Each structure stands twice: as structure tokens, then as C-alpha cells.
Amino acid sequence: SGAILKNYTWDIADGNVKASVLEIDLNDPYVQLEVVPGKGKFTQRATVSNMANRTDAIAMVNGDYYNMKAEGAPIGTTVIDGELVSSQSYLTGVYCLGITSDRTAFVDEFSFSGSVIAANGEKRNLSGLNKTFYWEETTGLHSHIGRLHLYSDLWGGSKRGMDSYVGTPAEVMVKDNQVTAVAFDGGFDSAVPEGCYILHGDG
């Protein structure tokens, strides 16, 4: 009862145009909206129909934009179960659809700021969380050159933000806020282990 599918057809000179609209009642307690990343993690690509079948969803839409020539991770902000899992890229005019805890829908722009603090107290800014490489629209700079990025175990790929412009990055494995391993000369050649983070730096 909380989801109604409506189909529309418009006749035009060259034929007709069809549109399917799903009307959702956010006040219905039996309705739940979720974010579904690919086959379960970022970079693990899947079609919309495959994701719907895997999760038994009654409907699904492609809710973000992706650089399919890169790792296929979302460009925009992603929040799952109230936790930020993908930060906003430094691009202009990118809006996000969100649902608040009281089930109110909104559309707005987001920004991201983050930092890491070393044991000696030194602080460095983070440029992104679970982001593939891109060119920043505001500065024209490469997103990963001379920057720090953080990757969680939701990032399914063995490479993080790498393209031909990036040099030889170094990576730090973190678990429970403790450094467990360091990899120079290109970083770790594996996905992020469950319960861990990888801090990726270049330059």
C-alpha cells in the first residue's frame, strides 16, 4: 500500500513516450528506502535489475553518477544506515537526495571536510572517503595527487584512486585507530580487509 506504480504514455509526432513513476508514501511503516552499492561494495559493478533481484527490492533506480572508465564508484555523497560511506566530490552543481530520521525527503548540496591526526599530534586534511580519481572542478587539480584519501572495507577494489597521472602512492592500514601495516611503492595490492581502513597518500 505504501508504493504505487503509475505508468504514463504521451503521444508525439514520432511515436510515443512512456514513463513509469513509483509513488512512495514515506509515512508507511512498511516502506523502506535503502542504498545498494553494486554487488555489495563500491567498485563491484552490477546492473540495476541484478541489484533489485539480489535485495528483493520492489523497485530500484540508479541513484548517482559514476566514472565508468575508472573504478565505478559513486561521484556524490553516500550514506548507509546513517553512516557516511562516500564523501562529496569537489564538483559544482551536484545535489543529493536524502531521507531524514523522521522520514522527510530533501534535496541539497553537501560538502566534505575530514582530517587525520598522527600519534605525534600532526594533523593532515583528508580529501575524500572512498573516492575514485577525478579532476576537481573548483581547482582544476587531480583529486589524488598530493592528497590523502581514506578507504573503508566498503571499497571492494584492490586499487584506490589510481590512474596514469598518479605517481607511486604509499598506504597505511588502520584497525581500531591503530596502524597495523605500512606499504610503500604503490600501496597494498588487495582490497581493504573487513573492519579496517586504508589511508592512501600520493606526493
Regions found by a protein language model. Name each.
Residues 1-203:
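Gly/Ser/Thr/Pro-rich low-complexity, intrinsically disordered segments
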